[in-house]
């Protein structure tokens, strides 16, 4: 090999250089946008369920409120509007992505204030409608934030952006979950929700400070009105994102979609049964809260940061395969805990392994999905990918309890781990395809 050939080969960045990616201003801004995206989630889920329970509602009524969260899984349905529709005044002042982020954040904050003012005992139907509006606005914010994240930086920085997003998101979940619960019990849930609404201001300030990505709307739809020519608009904004994806990826499109659907399926199937398993094993609620919220949070954030560095240093292929492997393998630690019983050190080991794997794969997979999108249809395509990622696991997790009842905990965890094997195979195939594409471009 000549020196010229050697010089022309791309060099992998060192670990210190890879870590330096977190100093980028857009990566720092992503931390606060991730916080804004994560804050409403618990407020229409676990924290809301606690408020309803404290207010004396029946378990049937409390359970029905869980359907509010389905809006997150179907956000692809209105993602084309976020991609293409201009908001009067705001879009001209802030740009396409920032205007939708700010509008959604105002919607979340306003509805949270209204929920705090009304309360569930005054008019449950209106209260439920406000909860639905919070979820809708929150899901809309997710669409816009994801689009901004993908368009704001190059592909090699998507791992760091995903890690920063996860960090902000997890901190927000801790505040709107554990923090709001504590405030609600000690003071009132109305005050807790008012405080959470005020914290949405963090995201609003961030939106006003960051730059709008320099990516134009799809030609032909930027000025197109859905009212003037709805058929043309639907074709350009809804149909074309799907056509473009299948045209660009050709025979690999089906493999990619299948991979998206099953990559994290073993983790989702197990996750819904984690707390019941801890309790059934003999751990107290205080022990679970203490270790999951402290050790678990540290582990998942560490995994997220490592995932960002791995993508910056090695690209996406290797980390995708490694992530699929550790997701399947770490599930076996739960089987070990089921054998050992209520052993605190083994509990800590299990929580660390599981959350480290979740954080790592979360970052890597978000970066991968970001690279799949075409910037002309960022919001629509990414919303479709994330919905596809969630729906199969959510569906299969509904059968987890029946499997535990029929086979027991150890067999269930072995089953959950084996469900990760197809993901490993597909991750390897996708990695090889990415490598072939890179070689052709070289």
PLM segments and residue spans:
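Glycine-rich segments within core transmembrane alpha-helices of 12-TM secondary carriers
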Residues: 72-75, 159-184, 388-397
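Symmetry-related core transmembrane helices of the 12-TM Major Facilitator Superfamily/SLC fold
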Residues: 103-109, 191-209, 413-429
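Helix-to-loop junctions at the C-terminal end of transmembrane segments
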Residues: 75-93, 302-319, 404-405
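Intracellular juxtamembrane helix-capping segments at the cytosolic ends
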Residues: 139-153, 360-374
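C-terminal ends and interior cores of transmembrane alpha-helices
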Residues: 99-121, 325-342
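Juxtamembrane intracellular "pre-TM" segments in multi-pass secondary transporters
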Residues: 7-23, 215-255
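Helix-loop boundary and gating motifs at the non-cytosolic
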Residues: 12-72, 253-259, 263-277, 281
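C-terminal transmembrane helical hairpin of 12-TM major facilitator-type secondary transporters
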Residues: 317-365
């Amino acid at each position: 090999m000549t020196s010229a050939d050697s010089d022309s080969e791309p060099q992998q960045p060192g670990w210190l250089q890879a870590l330096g990616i977190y100093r980028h201003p857009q990566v720092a801004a992503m931390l606060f946008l991730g916080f804004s995206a994560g804050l409403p989630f618990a407020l229409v889920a676990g924290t809301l369920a606690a408020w309803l329970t404290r207010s004396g509602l029946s378990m049937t009524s409390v359970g029905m409120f869980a359907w509010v969260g389905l809006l997150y899984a179907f956000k692809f349905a209105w993602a084309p509007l976020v991609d293409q529709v201009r908001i009067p005044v705001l879009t001209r002042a802030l740009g396409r992505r920032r205007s939708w982020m700010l509008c959604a954040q105002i919607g979340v904050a306003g509805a949270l204030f209204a929920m705090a003012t009304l309360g569930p005992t005054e008019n449950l139907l209106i209260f439920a409608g406000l909860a639905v509006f919070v979820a809708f606005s929150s899901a809309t914010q997710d669409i816009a934030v994801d689009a901004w994240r993908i368009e704001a930086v190059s592909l090699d920085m998507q791992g760091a952006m995903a890690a920063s997003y996860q960090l902000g998101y997890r901190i927000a979940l801790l505040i709107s979950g554990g923090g709001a619960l504590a405030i609600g019990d000690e003071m009132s849930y109305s005050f807790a929700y008012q405080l959470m609404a005020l914290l949405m201001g963090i995201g609003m300030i961030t939106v006003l400070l960051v730059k709008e990505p320099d990516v134009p709307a799809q030609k032909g739809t930027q000025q197109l009105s859905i009212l003037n020519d709805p058929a043309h608009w639907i074709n350009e904004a809804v149909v074309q994102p799907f056509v473009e994806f299948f045209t660009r990826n050709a025979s690999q499109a089906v493999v990619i979609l299948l991979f998206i659907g099953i990559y994290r399926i073993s983790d989702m199937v197990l996750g819904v049964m984690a707390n019941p398993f801890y309790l059934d094993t003999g751990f107290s609620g205080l022990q679970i809260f203490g270790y999951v919220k402290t050790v678990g949070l540290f582990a998942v954030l560490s995994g997220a940061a490592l995932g960002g560095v791995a993508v910056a240093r090695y690209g996406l292929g290797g980390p995708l395969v490694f992530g699929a492997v550790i997701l399947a393998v770490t599930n076996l630690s739960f089987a070990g805990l089921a054998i050992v019983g209520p052993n605190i050190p083994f509990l800590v080991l299990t929580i660390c392994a599981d959350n480290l794997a979740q954080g790592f794969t979360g970052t890597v997979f978000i970066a991968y999905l970001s690279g799949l999108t075409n910037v002309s249809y960022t919001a629509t395509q990414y919303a479709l990918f994330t919905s596809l990622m969630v729906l199969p696991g959510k569906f299969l997790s509904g059968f987890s309890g029946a499997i535990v009842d029929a086979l027991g905990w150890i067999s269930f965890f072995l089953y959950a781990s084996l469900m990760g094997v197809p993901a490993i195979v597909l991750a390897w195939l996708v990695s090889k395809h990415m490598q072939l594409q890179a070689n052709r471009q070289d």
